[in-house]
Amino acid sequence: MKAKELREKSVEELNTELLNLLREQFNLRMQAASGQLQQTHLLKQVRRDVARVKTLLTEKAGA
């Protein structure tokens, strides 16, 4: 997910996106713990997407 795409979204859409990412992160962690996760790079990718969304939410709250 590109930061440029995220910047165009509203705070409400960002909160929804954050919730979806956190759910996906949970599911990926459960798959990794049970040994079912084949694409381990997704853990890092989702973690960084969560950070991007949280950063933008903080920026929009301050503005």
Swiss-Prot record:
An annotated Gene Ontology molecular function: structural constituent of ribosome
InterPro entries in the cross-refs: Ribosomal_protein_uL29, Ribosomal_uL29, Ribosomal_uL29_CS, Ribosomal_uL29_sf
Domain of life: Bacteria
GO biological process, one term: translation
Pfam families, A to Z: Ribosomal_L29
Gene Ontology, cellular component aspect: cytosolic large ribosomal subunit
Keywords from the UniProt entry: Ribonucleoprotein, Ribosomal protein
CDD domains cross-referenced by the UniProt entry: Ribosomal_L29_HIP
Gene3D superfamilies: 6.10.140.1970
Statement: the UniProt record of this protein carries the keyword Ribonucleoprotein: yes
Family, as annotated: Belongs to the universal ribosomal protein uL29 family.
Record-linked NCBIfam families: L29
PANTHER family: 60S RIBOSOMAL PROTEIN L35/50S RIBOSOMAL PROTEIN L29 (PTHR10916), LARGE RIBOSOMAL SUBUNIT PROTEIN UL29C (PTHR10916:SF0)
Cross-referenced HAMAP family: Ribosomal_uL29
Name used for this protein in its record: Large ribosomal subunit protein uL29
Organism: Cronobacter sakazakii (strain ATCC BAA-894)
Lineage: Bacteria, Pseudomonadati, Pseudomonadota, Gammaproteobacteria, Enterobacterales
Gene transcribed to yield this protein: rpmC
